[in-house]
């Protein structure tokens, strides 16, 4: 039997598994079955906690989408990860250093129950996003058979394309998201953000995630939207980001600096399952 915990960050939900005290392995087929909301546990992503690969770090963790694919980064998952390792007694620290397949980051448990995550320095160089473009630009033209889109592009360890929309509530997120997430100019696929700027310190955002469709919240998507908005001269250093599942606060001092994301992480229940 495998012990697991169900958690969510603003409705972006996770199955979190302790791979430090348990010997666990998940095949893509098992992950897809567990992710099924009718026949399994149901989640957007599975988070697997592992011992650190580096003695200077506290943990390593792996992130799997509901379709079984492994991904590089997840902001909402990082907050749940921090709350999980503390709740399970795997650490007694309030400041936790971890690695994922995309790099290292620092997580800080706040007194009010929220978690602040150092999301790292955003990647704007197209070849590293990866995105097919000759040089970094504030905006890019993305052409499809149906229409042309104006977008910003950045990576937070995973690739993001951000579109500016007048009304996020009526945006065709499912249709446009499905169209752009596999666009040929993003060789590894892309998460697609739909950003409505309310004012320079406040945006509304919906995100169509690569491998998971639209989710209630996307932490890396919120960071990417703030980066793109700042670069385009629309946003301040600290921005409130309203997502369908709730609110995040993103702080970015500008190019070459890391982003800091603060938001909630909720425990739902503990369970055990036979694979």
Curated annotation (Swiss-Prot):
Keyword annotations for this protein, in alphabetical order, are: Amino-acid biosynthesis, Cytoplasm, Isomerase, Lysine biosynthesis
Disulfide cross-links: none
Instruction: Return the SUPFAM superfamilies for the record.
Output: Diaminopimelate epimerase-like
The primary location reported for this protein is cytoplasm
- Please list the residues that make up the active site: 74 (proton donor), 218 (proton acceptor)
Q: Which reaction does it catalyse?
A: (2S,6S)-2,6-diaminopimelate = meso-2,6-diaminopimelate
Site feature location: Could be important to modulate the pK values of the two catalytic cysteine residues: 160, 209
Q: Where is this site: Important for dimerization?
A: 269
Q: Which GO terms describe its molecular function?
A: diaminopimelate epimerase activity
Q: Where does substrate bind?
A: 12, 45, 65, 75-76, 158, 191, 209-210, 219-220
What EC number is given for this enzyme?
A: 5.1.1.7
Q: Which family does it belong to?
A: Belongs to the diaminopimelate epimerase family.
What job does this protein perform?
Catalyzes the stereoinversion of LL-2,6-diaminopimelate (L,L-DAP) to meso-diaminopimelate (meso-DAP), a precursor of L-lysine and an essential component of the bacterial peptidoglycan.
- NCBIfam families for the chain: DapF
Assembly, in brief, is: Homodimer.
Q: What's the protein here called?
A: Diaminopimelate epimerase
Give the originating organism.
Answer: Shewanella sp. (strain W3-18-1)
**Gene (name only):** dapF
């Amino acid at each position: 039997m495998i012990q697991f915990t169900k958690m969510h960050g603003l409705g972006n939900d996770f199955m979190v598994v302790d791979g430090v005290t348990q010997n666990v392995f998940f095949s893509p087929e098992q992950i897809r079955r567990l992710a099924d909301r009718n026949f399994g546990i149901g989640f957007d992503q599975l988070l697997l906690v592992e011992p650190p690969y580096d003695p200077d770090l506290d943990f390593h963790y792996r992130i799997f989408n509901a379709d079984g694919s492994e991904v590089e980064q997840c902001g909402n998952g990082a907050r749940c990860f921090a709350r999980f390792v503390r709740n399970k007694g795997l650490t007694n620290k309030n400041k936790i250093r971890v690695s994922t397949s995309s790099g290292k980051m620092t997580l800080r448990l706040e007194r009010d129950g929220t978690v602040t995550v150092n999301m790292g320095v955003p990647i704007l160089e197209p070849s590293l996003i990866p995105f097919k473009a000759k040089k970094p630009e504030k905006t890019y033209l993305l052409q499809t058979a149906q229409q042309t889109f104006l977008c910003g592009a950045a990576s937070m360890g995973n690739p993001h394309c951000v579109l500016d929309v007048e009304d996020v509530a009526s945006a065709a997120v499912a249709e446009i998201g499905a169209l752009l997430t596999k666009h040929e100019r993003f060789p590894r696929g892309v998460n697609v953000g739909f950003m409505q700027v309310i004012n320079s310190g406040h945006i509304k955002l919906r995100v169509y995630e690569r491998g998971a469709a639209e989710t209630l919240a996307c932490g890396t998507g919120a960071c990417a939207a703030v980066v793109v908005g700042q670069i385009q001269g629309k946003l301040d250093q600290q921005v409130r980001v309203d997502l369908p599942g709730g609110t995040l606060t993103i702080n970015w001092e500008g190019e070459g600096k890391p982003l800091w994301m603060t938001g909630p992480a909720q425990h739902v229940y503990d369970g055990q399952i036979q694979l």
